[in-house]
Amino acid sequence: MERNKIYKEDAIKFLTSVAEKSVDLAIIDPPYNMSKAEWDTFKSQNEFLKFTYHWIDALIPVLKDTGSLYIFNTPFNSAYILQYLVEKGLVFQNWVTWDKRDGFNASKNRYTHGQETILFFTRSKKYTFNADAIRIPYQSASRIESAQKKGILKNGKRWFPNPNGRLVGEVWHIASERHKNKIGGKTQKFEHLTPKPMEMIDRMVLASSNKADLVLDCFAGSGTTAVSAKKLGRNFLCADNNPQYVALANARLMEL
């Protein structure tokens, strides 16, 4: 299969065409069963889970033994997906909470929805993770400025902050595209319903792959994974069954 191309293809059919154990990193933003679009609507939760498990079964064989996998979804659906991945022998690494900063679907009957889950799994205990490549600024600038001069005492040892910032934790405070692009307080419409922030996809690509590695996305949408991979010197294999999204993704790639 030709690399660095976005295929107009159904996810499962696409995955069956990918060579076994060829993928270093898979970043998957699949349907959530939220009924907000035709591609995200299922007759029942059982039908949704059957579909989800089907593409997972097709995905696992294409991951290298050292490969990594990120899957977006709701916390509720992620609980099922996590259990299924564990049963399939993948190694759980993190349950990442993405704080979207947008307070979507505010309710007075329960806590406001403002997050999504990102499951981070690996094919085995041997995998790529470039922690230093994704460091972020320390939260307390004044405290860090003081620590850089004389250090901070932790467990009886003198600690000095890393000049490149702190390590990334399991809660990611990254504004959603709908939140970042509000005009006059109003959410703008996107060509794709749920685009993911480039900053977030870049973090995954930098952390869990190296230059020239192969990154896969079988629900490519507007092509953010492909754009990130190309920009950061990785190869990619992506697919989406919507021709409009494929055209949009290719247009974004042409701009690089």
Give the location of each predicted region.
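Core catalytic lobe of class I
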Residues: 1-248
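C-terminal helical cap(s) of enzyme catalytic domains, especially alpha/beta-barrels
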Residues: 246, 250-256
